[in-house]
Amino acid sequence: MALQRSDVEKIAHLARLGLNEGELPRITDALNSILGLVDQMQAVDTTGIEPLAHPLETTQRLRPDQVTESNQRDRYQAVAPSTENGLYLVPKVID
């Protein structure tokens, strides 16, 4: 699947990216290169291969599930611009 210039323009519009005329060919080529790599990976036969979450057979050392620091909510809320009932109040950004 190859992207056309119009596809890249539409994607840029949806992502609210301001691309100029000089950038469009470079971005189109870069995206097509990425999609080509994805096509190559999808073409590989992986039948019988067990999926891996991590390429190495290692495990994470877990620490005990204990509280390691004190509750500092009151201290943080004392310096916050606006709080109410233990919550931080922020300006509305979406109508």
UniProtKB/Swiss-Prot annotation:
Keyword Protein biosynthesis annotated: yes
Record-listed E.C. numbers: 6.3.5.-
Keywords: ATP-binding, Ligase, Nucleotide-binding, Protein biosynthesis
Gene Ontology biological-process annotations: glutaminyl-tRNAGln biosynthesis via transamidation; regulation of translational fidelity; translation
MF GO annotations: asparaginyl-tRNA synthase (glutamine-hydrolyzing) activity; ATP binding; glutaminyl-tRNA synthase (glutamine-hydrolyzing) activity
Catalytic activity: L-glutamyl-tRNA(Gln) + L-glutamine + ATP + H2O = L-glutaminyl-tRNA(Gln) + L-glutamate + ADP + phosphate + H(+); L-aspartyl-tRNA(Asn) + L-glutamine + ATP + H2O = L-asparaginyl-tRNA(Asn) + L-glutamate + ADP + phosphate + 2 H(+)
Root EC class: ligase
Functional description taken from the UniProt entry: Allows the formation of correctly charged Asn-tRNA(Asn) or Gln-tRNA(Gln) through the transamidation of misacylated Asp-tRNA(Asn) or Glu-tRNA(Gln) in organisms which lack either or both of asparaginyl-tRNA or glutaminyl-tRNA synthetases. The reaction takes place in the presence of glutamine and ATP through an activated phospho-Asp-tRNA(Asn) or phospho-Glu-tRNA(Gln).
Homology family: Belongs to the GatC family.
HAMAP family for the chain: GatC (MF_00122)
Oligomer and partners: Heterotrimer of A, B and C subunits.
Protein's recorded name: Aspartyl/glutamyl-tRNA(Asn/Gln) amidotransferase subunit C
Lineage start: Bacteria, Pseudomonadati, Pseudomonadota, Gammaproteobacteria, Pseudomonadales
Gene: gatC
